[in-house]
């Protein structure tokens, strides 16, 4: 109450921010008259002037007002569109490492031109990131004339480009592209073997459109580049046949309750658990199928792989539904994005889940994958020097943006007041009654000529609704993952009088629904439209537009509440753009997933108190509040999962940064001769110490073992015993020095034989190839460690601390193995000439081409093993924003406490 009083007196933090931005808007508006008088050439010359002033030491902040005034004036001349004051405010928010919440239809695409131009003046590149290829191409082409007028180049980064085209896209001043492509390019660059193979410049400024979709919805999903592993498709098929024999029970076994079923499903945690009875039944079925030895246990160490197959098959059958989580297209299982309803071709679930779903659907089972490189969007975007984003719905997730990314959210006011009517939810007892009410509402709207957009949460639901509409002979368009090629076209005309559009979730986001239909798309459909054609189409549209406004604007119908309030707000936000009229209502039933899993008891009790009967709907603020509380619970749980994932991935991220930094230094170095000499001395000294312990008596020495090891691993035939027999005064220190010197002489002889340039190139190739192989094995080891780490909680240990400790030990082992393997290869391999190095490089490229790389998203829940347990066991540690380059004198990111140059920076 006291806080509300202070807010009324001083205004909210958002109000105070807008007040500050308003002062800069006044400055920009004051420049407008002066800039209108400039010729085109004088306006274009402003870009060179700004760049020169930056070089002399002025900051972007000092240039902002003039740069924004320049873009506004250029936009008036090129597009005949003038940036509103609220768009200038949005541009300022985006330039200051913040998130701008701007409502649908407020011109986010045009707003983005302001900070994109300003930050491109530095010459370091600007990345404008969208959710799909269509929007990236559309926005780039739409804004290209404006940027080119101002002397800025524009690139588009989408999948399928050649290396040269990608390089050109990244070298442009402003690059549009998708989040996936930018992330994968980063991983590919860090797998390159030559500096020329890299495409990205250092990551400077990212401006993310639909930032909530990318930084929140996709945050649990790591990007993975993987190669094919061993083929086990037959095993997936055989295990798949056993699952239909298992029976589900309603709840998990406890001390008080032991059920009759074989497994139970925890819908909240999206997990499936086998009962003891189920384990015995599965073991019996596996024995009968010849997959498990008589009397053997599924849980013995030798059968871990088989247990993995059983778990994957059980999850595929119980948790993943066709036309909800995936569709089958062209004999392939294609994942459906739960947040947008779009299909994601080329993406695959990890840990054998995708293969289990393929076996369930009877399509061709593709090989399992082995991770070659991976990163989460959370960690990729934190690598940028500057980060900003815009969306129509960010305020509900403001805490997460601040906590994870250090980004404040500013709600930018609309240009015209919002007049959409958001009506309370209607709740029915059954789904059948709910759909009857939805059909009745649609009929009512059609009679009045009011367009309707119906939002569903799955393809299955949209197809059910489509069948019901067909039964009632109501013409409509369906927009879901199966037909998204027609997406923009359908969305463009969804505002016509009486139009009914059924959209899965928020497919079609990014395209405005214009009341009366989109007249521009009608003009584009004509080959050579004349002035008369354009005037006629505009006049027809004016009549249609006014009729739709008269009917009440676009009516939004939600068939179910989403887990997140933000997704519901996105659906509502399609109506009421730029002061247009509109309305929205959600229809719910007690059989909906959210109600059934999270809100059923409380709402059911309310319904009983209110005396509800079949066919009746309840419309009460209590119910709406109860549903929103249920959504808050789910949002908080999902935030916890994302936070836990980030804390675990931060451990891998620190190691990733060390490895990638070393890799890039090795690749950019002219020669790594000094590095090889340093690690050679370490390795040989370490090997000697195993057989001749430091400061030990001669009786403890294992000289034959040392001679044998040096010969087998390093190709060094040294008469160590002979030296000791002949020289009584040969001490341990002197012996060490002699062995190291002899190795160096042998290596120098090899250098003289093949030539210095050839050997230097060979050293680099061996170092990079060995590092890549060991890093790949290390990622697999980290995956295995993470999957079982939550069990440490039962031993009263903190899983997070244990993970940090063990992953650090694994990393240390990897670096020691790297040193040893590199020296062993360089010592033993006989390089005759340049052709040998070329042959090695050719073999590497052939191997690279043979490994069919998959670009995939690991399935979210599997990434943290059992997130619900993990969230309870792990302590909540604040996440620190990172991504800075590690200096040689900085503390090493691995957590050892040493300086980087004395720890993991040693290699470079």
Curated annotation (Swiss-Prot):
Enzyme Commission number(s) of this protein: 7.4.2.8
Binding of Zn(2+), residues: 892, 894, 903-904
InterPro entries recorded: Helicase_ATP-bd, Helicase_C-like, P-loop_NTPase, SEC_C_motif, SecA, SecA_CS, SecA_DEAD, SecA_motor_DEAD
GO biological process terms on file: intracellular protein transmembrane transport; protein import; protein targeting; protein transport by the Sec complex
A single Gene Ontology CC term: cell envelope Sec protein transport complex
Record's protein name: Protein translocase subunit SecA
Its job: Part of the Sec protein translocase complex. Interacts with the SecYEG preprotein conducting channel. Has a central role in coupling the hydrolysis of ATP to the transfer of proteins into and across the cell membrane, serving both as a receptor for the preprotein-SecB complex and as an ATP-driven molecular motor driving the stepwise translocation of polypeptide chains across the membrane.
GO molecular function, one term: protein-exporting ATPase activity
Cited Gene3D superfamilies: Helical scaffold and wing domains of SecA, P-loop containing nucleotide triphosphate hydrolases, SecA, preprotein cross-linking domain
Its membrane topology: Peripheral membrane protein
Annotated ATP binding sites: 87, 105-109, 512
Domain of life of the native organism: Bacteria
The protein's required cofactors: Zn(2+)
Subunit structure: Monomer and homodimer. Part of the essential Sec protein translocation apparatus which comprises SecA, SecYEG and auxiliary proteins SecDF-YajC and YidC.
Database matches in SUPFAM superfamilies: Helical scaffold and wing domains of SecA (SSF81886), P-loop containing nucleoside triphosphate hydrolases (SSF52540), Pre-protein crosslinking domain of SecA (SSF81767)
Keywords, alphabetical: ATP-binding, Cell inner membrane, Cell membrane, Cytoplasm, Membrane, Metal-binding, Nucleotide-binding, Protein transport, Translocase, Translocation, Transport, Zinc
Cofactor binding summary note: May bind 1 zinc ion per subunit.
Principal EC category: translocase
Biased composition, class Basic residues, residue ranges: 898-908
Region named Disordered: 882-908
Reactions listed under catalytic activity: ATP + H2O + cellular proteinSide 1 = ADP + phosphate + cellular proteinSide 2
Family per similarity comment: Belongs to the SecA family.
Subcellular location: Cell inner membrane; Cytoplasm
